[in-house]
Amino acid sequence: MRELFGIVPTLDLHGLGVREAVSETERFLREAQAQHLPSVRIVYGKGHGSPGGRGVLREVIPRWLETDGQHLVARFERRPDASGADGALMVWPKKLSD
């Protein structure tokens, strides 16, 4: 699915530890809700800089969205880059009730 106007607000979590990444993700999604943004992008990377070459955030962030962050998110899906590698999520924040 393409975004109609091309620019999607993006949070880049590269270089952050788990606690800081989760905290930044929550802050970003609350701000997205407050601004009534239809969708946002969260980049966690592929893990090339992580020990073992497998990123921790690629597992932690989606799991957090499904559990503790579910009250902020209507849905999300992984978004591969041009090479087909998974390093980002497209997230649709829940709308705030009036």
Write out the residue ranges for each language-model feature.
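Long, charged, low-complexity intrinsically disordered regions
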Residues: 1-98
